[in-house]
């Protein structure tokens, strides 16, 4: 009886002291984001269409598809649940996650942005010269400010979540490389979850939007995993992106280089997509319908990482004790 009790107490103590519950809380966080996002999506859709009808300056909101409201709802849910996640993990400051203040943050953001955006535009120029992409008839110059705002918001939010909170927490449990690979894979999986772009059949299957429409759309976000070319060209590129961002974060003990890189990739992707269009439907495996998919983007991201780590300034801030 005494041995059994001692074993039970020891097991409980070991369980409480281990970091395994951290991983479970992170998994629960992502499940909760999917559930809350699906619940919020119809309300965002109704609110957006109402605002579009009530305010002429916001009329464009009535033309936004339910899929885009669904994506934004997931983003809202991720932000809303981030604070409870941090509290449950007993994270009080960035130093608890191995991050330190970076006095050279402007330099790191600027270099990361210029390198990522510059090489992505270089890839775009090659695709234009090769005839795989062409300039749009009506250039969407008005999309450029939106691309800049989106790049800033997405990079700060996602780097705070993935390379800040998640990578810092997983490193408590696993070694450096297992943690980096796990978070990079998670980053790629999350970005691979999106509804199909072919809206007509999808909207027909959904019918009129009701408060459970988000849950009806939720199973359809996994469609890209059934396409082997998309899985190879898209998922692998996203994985290398996530791995690069994670490695530079731990090398500098700061998020700013990763934020600059991420913002450069988002701005380059959205700008090129606004100004050009593919000349044919099937370009895989070399390139897809945007600069995120294909072996060409994969090589470009890998080259960006190699240049960054080779030439980056070595005077980086050190973590606090």
Locations of regions flagged by a protein language model:
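N-terminal, membrane-interfacial amphipathic/helix-forming hydrophobic leader that caps
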Residues: 1-94, 98-101, 105, 117, ...
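Alpha-helix N-cap/helix-start motif at helix boundaries, enriched for small hydrophobics
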Residues: 97, 159, 258-259
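Gly/Ser/Thr-rich helix-start
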Residues: 99, 113, 156, 165, ...
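Residue-level signature of the transmembrane alpha-helical core
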Residues: 109, 113, 117, 148, ...
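Hydrophobic alpha-helical segments and helix pairs
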Residues: 129-161, 165-166
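The feature captures the transmembrane alpha-helix scaffold of multi-pass secondary transporters
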Residues: 144, 148-149, 177, 181, ...
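Membrane-interface helix/loop boundary segments of multi-pass membrane proteins
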Residues: 157-210, 250-254
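Catalytic-adjacent loop/helix segments of enzymes that bind and process anionic phosphate/sulfate esters
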Residues: 217
